[in-house]
């Protein structure tokens, strides 16, 4: 794969003609001559992590329904598909949205499959992309740039595709506020509000006392403390524990951690030594107790603090983030690649709302995350990161309104990333007026679903929960229409 698809762009100077090895994995179990190629975009992880999509998930479902070939393409700078031996700021300059989606088109034109006798290269075979989350956005961007009747890519499904970039993404916590157990949500909102009040007083003794209740007095930085106690909900950027995002209809991938957390926070049978903690900081809030503080703190001490496995609480091996040299480590890693993309183009820093019920402390704002960018990517000889992400480079594809032929959009109603997706509450209402529009702009919001829940399967669509089952049937119908259209255009082209 070419490292640089844009030799005329000053953005990538000095240019290189070098190539790199980009891994892909394919399954021809269902393939029959004339069938489509389904390209699963690997996104921000290694290719192996996506194998379930070929084995039981959405690609398996579509392959079986259409006699297709399934392929997973590992994204550049992830897994073993790294162009360089390290990831300095200069070496990362080729990690951009436009280079990544150019990989997808180039791969479709040049890929080989040793067990298949004939060539399946685009545009002589119908290539249909699928991606979830960031890869869902890349699917949409790929179709907009390289799709169409005369393009390279024939169609694509963007699942929970985060096509909109914002600097601060405060909406991440909205589904928890709305759909979480309200006695749990209300307790956390009130506790966090009190924590922020104590912080605002500047009373360092009270702040240290407050942190000590959670077993986190060693964390001098308020942001580090705030992020650590937010982990059961989903801490900004890092998720060392499962949270709302890991809820799943498929038992093999589901986690009960969020429900266990809320059950602990609202425990009516907590012993007195725990419930008395609710009053330990009341002197700082006009005598008002901090309802369920003891339960919340007890959960953090029992389930979060032990994750450090003996490391110092304020170290980067635990919950400290204030070590500049830690961030400047240039070894290749998925987390470094993802951070670079976040810092340069996509932003979307999880942050607390400045007003109203917070769920997470208002210590968690854009500057807290932005400082990691500054430390991680010092200016190189050829490349430097912007002071804040250049969101326009990501949003130029259309944001909520990415327009492309044969682009299907599917989202989950309770997804924490929903407000960056097509069905965002900040986007226009999504109502399909007629059958023609349904074919031209296929879209579906899955009731009660989370983050790209349609990507999971159990090898029996009929046995799935009804809203997932019907989502998969909708995707099959959508793809079949695209393939009928492909055959029709091919036949008309031959007859001309």
Regions found by a protein language model. Give the residues of each.
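Catalytic-loop region of hydrolases
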Residues: 1-69, 80, 94, 477, ...
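Loop/turn elements at helix/coil->beta-strand transitions in domains of secreted/extracellular proteins
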Residues: 34-37, 66-70, 124-126, 149-154, ...
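Active-site machinery of serine-nucleophile hydrolases
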Residues: 36-37, 43-105, 339, 430-459
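Conserved acidic catalytic loop of the alpha/beta-hydrolase fold
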Residues: 102-124
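Alpha/beta-hydrolase fold nucleophile elbow
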Residues: 117-134, 138
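Short glycine-enriched nucleophile-adjacent loop
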Residues: 134-148, 156, 163
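A catalytic-pocket lid/entrance helix-loop region that shapes and gates access to the active site
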Residues: 149-282
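C-terminal subdomain of alpha/beta-hydrolase-fold enzymes, centered on the catalytic histidine
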Residues: 237-495
